[in-house]
Regions:
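NAD(P)H dinucleotide-binding glycine-rich loop of Rossmann-like/cofactor-binding domains
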Residues: 22, 94-193, 334
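Helix-to-beta-strand junctions that scaffold the AdoMet/dcAdoMet cofactor pocket
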Residues: 276-278
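Adenosine-nucleotide cofactor-binding segment
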Residues: 192-195, 207-271
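C-terminal hydrophobic helical "lid"/dimerization subdomain
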Residues: 1, 254, 270-274, 319-368
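Glycine-rich Rossmann-fold phosphate-binding loop(s) that bind the pyrophosphate
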Residues: 195-196, 288
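Rossmann-fold dehydrogenase core element
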Residues: 282-284, 296-338
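Glycine-rich beta-strand-centered segment in the early N-terminal region that forms part
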Residues: 23-37, 50-99, 104, 112, ...
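N-terminal Rossmann-fold NAD(P) dinucleotide-binding loop
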Residues: 199-200
């Protein structure tokens, strides 16, 4: 079949709208009509050429929602017309990682997904016989996609696609880090570094669980208003305090119980750890640093009880937890509407990247 898609032909170049050939679903695969997709910073990271795993030409996008059009042989968990979110972190429920119950990082299809291919080591996309690679196993910048069944989360049908798509990455990454990774308890003091889309979702996750102080750290004072709306209690601009770590420790009566780094900067990663409370403070790295970067701190910070951890896709198990997060939104527990600042047709997708680079959007959504 034919599908319209925004193709990344090479790093650093704008996406171009193309008619792409899409092979139908094979055994254990699902054909989805994507109705909406967010434009995430990870897409920009890959498009910029900074991503060492970036492969071109490819169809980017990993934050989508849509409808099942067709299923391949053996598919049992979804059927035609189901509303779904494609998952860049699948959940096979059978691999060593899934069975451990210690992680959400299913590895069932990781080796081929990282090469821009389906589990059978082929691509479903092509133009004039030339292979176009998949991206993060999802490629939601295409109106139609084929994904493995283990990478499809069925969601309720009354959830609007233009909001549900954001659960495919940003909402889950932030809210999930609080609820599934850190398991923040009521009354805890939380510090959030970076008030972009991920940071704001961390903040509303902390508010959901009843955190005490929720302190936002950012150099952009324009974020104060929306961060307070999502639950931030205090704002700190690092450029306006002499000793950021000391200031945060003072604000939290000895240090944060939990901190979250949502920027991808190794300097703020260190600050996020060192502002944690002696004896029990936990710092979670969510932001992705540039290739080759390394983190450092004095070992004594860890010896004296602080913990340095990471969170990917919010620690959420895709097929199990993503539908719950959509329910939280539909039940009014989560605010997604105010995070969607721009909606665009596919033909204007490059404008969405420009808005992100200029810091003028929280999340732009492409509607098909």
């Amino acid at each position: 079949m034919k599908t319209k898609a925004a193709v990344a032909w090479k790093a650093g170049a704008p996406l171009t709208i193309e008619e792409v050939d899409l092979a139908g679903p094979g055994e254990g695969e699902v054909l989805i009509e994507v109705k909406a997709t967010g434009i995430c910073h990870t897409d920009y990271y890959t498009l910029s050429g900074a991503d060492p795993e970036g492969i071109f030409p490819a169809i980017l996008g990993h934050e989508g929602a849509g409808v099942v059009v067709e299923t391949g042989a053996g598919v049992t968990s979804v059927k035609k017309y189901d509303h779904v979110i494609p998952l860049y972190t699948p959940e096979c429920r059978q691999c060593k990682y899934c069975l451990s119950r210690k992680t959400n990082l299913c590895q069932a299809i990781r080796s081929t997904q990282g090469k821009g291919l389906m589990p059978d080591s082929t691509s479903r996309f092509s133009i004039g016989g030339k292979v176009i690679y998949h991206y993060m196993g999802t490629s939601t910048f295409s109106n139609y996609i084929v994904v493995p069944e283990i990478a499809v989360a069925k969601i309720r049908e009354d959830a609007p696609f233009d909001k549900a798509c954001y659960v495919g990455c940003g909402v889950t990454t932030g809210v999930g880090a609080v609820i599934f990774s850190a398991k923040v308890e009521a009354g805890a003091n939380v510090v959030v570094f970076g008030l972009g889309g991920i940071g704001l979702n961390v903040i509303q996750g902390a508010r959901m669980v009843g955190a005490n102080k929720i302190i936002g750290v950012d150099i952009n004072p324009r974020r104060i208003g929306i961060a307070r709306k999502f639950g931030m209690t205090d704002f700190v601009n690092p450029n306006e305090v002499e000793n950021l770590v000391g200031h945060l420790i003072q604000l939290t009566d000895g240090g944060a119980d939990y901190s979250f780094e949502c920027i991808g900067n190794v300097t703020t990663m260190r600050q996020a750890l060192e502002c944690c409370h002696k004896g029990w403070g936990q710092s979670y790295i969510i932001g992705v640093a540039a290739a080759g970067e390394e983190i450092s701190t004095r070992p004594f910070q860890l010896v004296t009880g602080r913990e340095w951890k990471g969170s990917a896709f919010g620690g959420a198990r895709g097929r199990t937890d993503v539908p719950k997060i959509v329910d939280w939104y539909m039940d009014g527990k989560l605010n997604i509407d105010d995070l969607i600042t721009h909606t665009l047709p596919l033909e204007r997708i490059n404008e969405g990247f420009d808005l992100m680079k200029l810091g003028e959007s929280i999340r732009s959504v492409v509607l098909y």
